Amino acid sequence: MSSEQIISLIGFPGSGKSTVGVLLAKRLGANFVDTDILIQNQEKATLAEIIDQHDHVYLRRLEEQVLLDMPIHPSVISTGGSVVYSPKVMARLAEASIVVFLSARLDTVEYRISLAPDRGIASSKEQTLADIYRERVPLYERWARVTVAVDDTAPEALVDQLIIKLDALSR
């Protein structure tokens, strides 16, 4: 495991991609890129505001465009939760990086999202969180080379687990 690798974190909003990503990048001495922050800086709005002002499809297109346009250098990349809807982006990430799925139970996601009302979830108004969860989890599982369950585990311990799994891949 080295700072020369590219690691892409995927998972539902609230799964800890940003938190774990920062810690993992620090531990590896790698750069950290959060595509949600790139989008918010570009749009000068929170993800929730972007969805309110436009719609969920617009946010998904932004996520896709940011990841297709972004040069991929050795780093830890935290992706937006709906990035798995873009086969083009996921194929690019799978080819250029180790895709890691931070897997969280639905109750964990619901709780964490309730703590962050500014978090935007790219979905239609008719979809419940459970609907989106059931739709996305198989997509996350399909693209992941590594999966780590995040429920009831401290971020530092998740990073320890991740490093062990990533080291095993490079052997």
Model-derived features: where do they sit?
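P-loop (Walker A) phosphate-binding loop of NTP-binding proteins
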Residues: 12
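Short glycine-rich anion-binding loops that position phosphate/pyrophosphate groups of nucleotides
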Residues: 81-83, 105-107, 153
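Hydrophobic anchor at the beta1->P-loop junction of P-loop NTPases
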Residues: 9
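ATP-dependent small-molecule kinase phosphotransfer cores
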Residues: 35-83, 87-94
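A glycine- and Lys/Arg-enriched "phosphate-lid" helix/loop adjacent to the NTP-binding pocket
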Residues: 95-138
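Conserved glycine(s) of the Walker
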Residues: 16
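Walker A (P-loop) ATP-phosphate-binding motif of ABC ATPase nucleotide-binding domains
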Residues: 6
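NTP-dependent small-molecule kinase module
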Residues: 1-3, 19, 23, 27, ...
